[in-house]
Amino acid sequence: MSLRFNLIVTPFSNYEIRNRRETFPVQKFLMTTSKSAIKVKCSLKTSIDLVGKIREKINGKVDNSLEVPTINYLVDIPSNLCMIDSLERLGVARYFQSEIDGVLEKTYRLWQQREKDIFADVTCRAMAFRFLRVKGYEVSSDELAPYADQVHVNPQISDVTTVVELYRASQVRIYEEDSILEKLHAWTSTFLKQQLQSKTISDKKLHEQVEYYLKNYHGIQNQVAVRRSLDLYDIDHYPILKVADRFRIIYNEDFFVFLRQDFNLCQAQHQKELQQLQRWYEDCRLDTLNYGRNVVHVSCFLAAANFGDPELSNARLAFAKTIVLVTRIDDFFDLAGSREESYKILELVKEWKEKPTEDYGSKEVEILFTALYDTVNEFAEIAYIEQGRCVKPLLIKLWVELLTSFKKELDSWTDDTALTLDEYLSSAWMSIACRVCTLTALQFLGVKLSEEMLSSQECTDLCRHLSFVNRLLNDVQTFERERKENTINAVSVLLAAHRHERAITEEEAISKIQEIVEQNRRKLMRMVYQRESVFPRKCRNVFLEVSKMGHYLYASGDELTTPQQLMEDMKSLVFEPLALHPLETNNVIASGKN
């Protein structure tokens, strides 16, 4: 059974638009990992227009008699940018990436020419700046200088939706010395907080969206945000639309059927992968360990939140399994194992050979090593197909580096060795395991990665900045617990380092660490956004998404150890079906009356 969507022809740009008809399966869940079955096809031969592509995606044609004449219109950048923002927030931008790239290239040319359609409207200017900077175009924040101080801002533009766009623009600050974005962020965040506190945002959906942005902007997980956007979606909050009819294409019941089917497809895949993770966990006998954390559900959620495309199943499973293994072994080093047993695991990984049962020394060591050994070997086999070369030496090396950092930390706190913050971070950035999790998952993105790329200084710097962010965020939230456990932590190291100088308070130490987090986050963003790179942008994006994961996990607690918000988000992302949108509901009611 299939659905056919018929949409009106809507003028949008100067590109060719042709009407087509396309069919989509109706079934709620499609349990498959086949790329050809999962990926919704998007081949165009006649049109490169953004809305034309959306129309062809949803409405396609089955015979030439339905073809409509070519229509040419002037480019409308404000509407195009709103369209892109909607597609990204609704999680379907991946189907229109070439069209989005074309729109942003045109936007950049007009930005350089200071086109009035962009610069005359504050919201459009802020949105264009954000999109262009994220895409890697050289755009200066000087163009936002007129809005850097609230006292100089015309009260007429200080409506909530405009300030939200200025706030989002301020979040792409990549230089420490950028005082314009710093000031912009200061007043827009204050303004929006005041609006929430005074309850002056009458639109409930907009109120919730502002609340969501302010809560933890850099910890927003893409797929969680998609689910929220689908629940809250309302085109009415865009103030710069010149022709409302142009948005009928993304605000009608047919489009929401498409969105819901796309989300349900992804959700079904996540459910299947959770079952696979649970079977793997039991097959590896990790469920028999009577210590530490079982993070199967947590890891499944984090993988789903970071790698949203249905076809990236191998990347999600590799990422999730690596998180589980890291957590189990980390807990063994910290809590359950003796120093000798911990050393034994490192020796076994260096040797990388299976042993007779009696040679492992303990049941726990045997289970942990064999689980790691079998899983990494499986990764290597799958990656060989995708990469066209053996990556097992790389994967083993990553684990040796990680376990060596575990050993250094173990030696430091058991020997009560005094460290400076720099000495601590020299190994602690490795022990947060971002490097092994990220580089393992990168093997399964469908991008060929050479040894030179993975051993480059750029790769090392990406890993280091990412790891500094997540390591220090973790340390701030786990400081009290780890102090009681007598384990090493950046906060305790900083406090101890000033013991013989001017003593600093815990608040001052935490503030200093948060400054380091921000510095490394901006450096990471700059590396991800830059155009010149040995890594494709698809790979660099993963580093940024994993840093957002750190902000998500350690915003106000330790969601990895005691997941609360995470479990709520997992329900909506993995388990709860997407409800009918009011537009669809109205259509169903109307159909029932006929």
Swiss-Prot record:
For binding Mg(2+) 2, which residues are annotated in this chain's numbering?
330, 334
**Cofactor binding notes:** Binds 3 Mg(2+) ions per subunit.
Which reactions appear under catalytic activity for this entry? Answer: peregrinol diphosphate = labd-13(16),14-diene-9-ol + diphosphate; 9alpha-copalyl diphosphate = syn-isopimara-7,15-diene + diphosphate
Report the InterPro entries cross-referenced here.
Isoprenoid_synthase_dom_sf, Terpene_synth_N, Terpene_synth_N_sf, Terpene_synthase-like, Terpene_synthase_metal-bd, Terpenoid_cyclase/PrenylTrfase
Q: Which Pfam families match?
A: Terpene_synth, Terpene_synth_C
Key word Cell wall biogenesis/degradation present: no
Q: Where, by residue number, does Mg(2+) 3 bind?
A: 474, 477, 482
A GO term, aspect molecular function: syn-isopimara-7,15-diene synthase activity
* Placement of sequence motif DDXXD motif: 330-334
Top-rank EC class of the record's enzyme? lyase
GO terms for CC?
Answer: chloroplast
Bilayer-crossing residues are none
Magnesium keyword on record: yes
Which coenzyme or cofactor does it need?
Answer: Mg(2+)
Q: Which UniProt keywords apply?
A: Chloroplast, Lyase, Magnesium, Metal-binding, Plastid
Under which EC number(s) is this enzyme classified? Answer: 4.2.3.-
Q: Which Gene3D superfamilies match?
A: Farnesyl Diphosphate Synthase, Terpene synthase, N-terminal domain
Q: What does this protein do?
A: Involved in the biosynthesis of labdane-type diterpenoid including cleroda-dienols, and peregrinol lactones and furan derivatives, dopaminergic diterpenoids that can bind to dopamine receptors in the human pituitary gland, have probably ability to lower prolactin levels, and are used to treat menstrual cycle disorders (e.g. premenstrual syndrome and mastodynia). Terpene synthase the catalyzes the conversion of peregrinol diphosphate to labda-13(16),14-dien-9-ol, and of syn-copalyl diphosophate to dehydroabietadiene and syn-isopimara-7,15-diene.
Q: Which PANTHER family match?
A: CIS-ABIENOL SYNTHASE, CHLOROPLASTIC, ENT-COPALYL DIPHOSPHATE SYNTHASE, CHLOROPLASTIC
Q: What is this protein called?
A: Class I diterpene synthase TPS6, chloroplastic
Question: Per UniProt, what is the name of the gene that codes for the protein in this document?
Answer: TPS6
